[in-house]
Design a protein with these regions (language model features):
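N-terminal start-of-chain detector that recognizes signal peptides
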Residues: 13-17, 28-32, 48-51, 92-97, ...
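Primarily the internal scaffold of c-type cytochrome electron-transfer domains
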Residues: 85-121, 194-195, 199
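Aromatic-capped interface at the extracytoplasmic side
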Residues: 20-38
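Hydrophobic membrane-insertion alpha-helices, especially the h-region
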Residues: 6-24
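Cytosolic-side transmembrane helix boundary signature
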Residues: 1-4
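Short secondary-structure boundary/capping segments
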Residues: 33-34, 112-113, 176
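Sequence context surrounding c-type heme c attachment/ligation sites in exported
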Residues: 38-88, 121-202
Length: 202
């Protein structure tokens, strides 16, 4: 009788822990504070690059229209411009010098991931961009169910999930958006996209 009581107590503790983790994950926005922008080894103000200089997303994130991940640019991509452009402020010059030093010493830049997905989930950027930029598809809806007025270009497609990156000093998940499974399923449903488990889960 005593071993059964001990086993029952252990099971209760384990189940309580699992329930607590699930509740924290569900009510955190996003889970465990991961939505806060992580600090990066080099400051990269999208406001300067995208809003002021009109550099398109796919110039730096070259894989975004071709594969699963958007990927961060290689140092060589940064030097395409910053071999000659020093930056307008002392702070900008210091950050650009970090890029040049990384290139000169053949040291990769250890960028911190901003958007995290569980290992069992895949998000194929190319498929989303192909769908939203396809002009032969009629009405399309954004992540919150808002009707998109026309087929967006690549940069506008990025804003559907990432928010207005051009006006963000620091990239972080879209304001008020946790990008949980339900968010993805809702967007798939409103756009009549399959919601089979295997579409997004490995």
């Amino acid at each position: 009788m005593v071993p059964l009581m001990v086993a029952g107590g252990v099971v209760t503790v384990i189940m309580g822990f699992i329930v607590a983790v699930l509740l924290i994950s569900w009510f955190s926005n996003p889970p465990f504070g991961l939505g806060n922008a992580p600090s990066q080894p080099i400051a990269f103000p999208h406001t300067v690059h995208v809003a002021e200089n009109n550099i398109q997303c796919e110039f730096c994130h070259r894989n975004v229209t071709k594969g699963e991940a958007a990927t961060v640019p290689a140092v060589e991509t940064c030097l395409f411009c910053h071999k000659d452009i020093d930056g307008g402020t002392v702070a900008a010059q210091e950050e650009i010098n970090k890029v040049r030093t990384a290139f000169d010493t053949d040291t990769p830049i250890d960028w911190a991931r901003v958007h995290r997905l569980p290992d069992h989930v895949r998000f194929i950027h190319e498929a989303h961009i192909r769908y939203f930029t396809d002009e032969t598809i009629g009405v399309k809806y954004g992540i919150n169910g808002e009707e998109l007025s026309e087929s967006p270009d690549v940069a506008q497609t990025c804003t559907i999930c990432h928010g207005d990156v051009a006006n963000k000093e620091v990239v972080q998940p879209k304001t008020g958006q946790s990008l949980k499974m339900g968010t993805c399923v809702d967007c798939h449903r409103v756009n009549s996209i399959p919601t089979d488990c295997t579409v997004c889960h490995k």
